[in-house]
């Protein structure tokens, strides 16, 4: 078996920042168990597998492909950064002739559009509903201790818990927070929560430029302690912060060690466009 494989850093234009994803191009059907084995071998938060949908398709001329995402532990229903990385490989390395690509996924059809300053992902927008604090208080205290919380929301579609920190905190505070993700696994065992979003209102002008909000994302339930930059989390964050700020166009920064920024536009059809850059950092062949 020889498979073309790439690593691209998503939601950045600089190598070694943003969120790295492995991208595998599948010329032929792959044994089901090999998807997970390859993802575990790559040991990144996600490995994406792009497959041809019809025998006569090819990666240069076709515009519609199948796409699946795997963490080192299991398959996930949606991954924004690995979708961006997949589109970047097809657009910039394979030189696909189309300006818009369609990916058939567990979350429906997702489109990626090439623009001069990045790639725009057309993603579903997920509402986050008010969450009773007492039901998740142990989880929140385990994650952030006595840190002041301003709002708690829950997205049943994505099983993500959104915790907004008090507006009295700033970006530096969010960046410095230590979250013991192993303890989260011991506290939340019901399956209700599969991802924890910590978020904070942006500061006017920010530290170097204006961001509407900041976030960090933790998903130990999927084998990912902290994800560097998370497109799927922003399908929830976009809905929340648009409502809070009364804006349809947002600029966001995810405050992981690697960091990454996202340009967001909520659409009238109930979906969201999320734009980011990508840097291709590795190209090779997987042999087994």
Curated annotation (Swiss-Prot):
Q: Which GO terms describe its molecular function?
A: identical protein binding; isomerase activity
GO biological process annotation, one example? maintenance of gastrointestinal epithelium
Going by the UniProt record, its keywords in alphabetical order are:
Isomerase
Entry's NCBIfam families? PhzF_family
What is the annotated quaternary arrangement, including any partners? Interacts with UNRIP/MAWD.
Q: Cellular component per GO?
A: cytoplasm
Instruction: Specify the protein name.
Output: Phenazine biosynthesis-like domain-containing protein
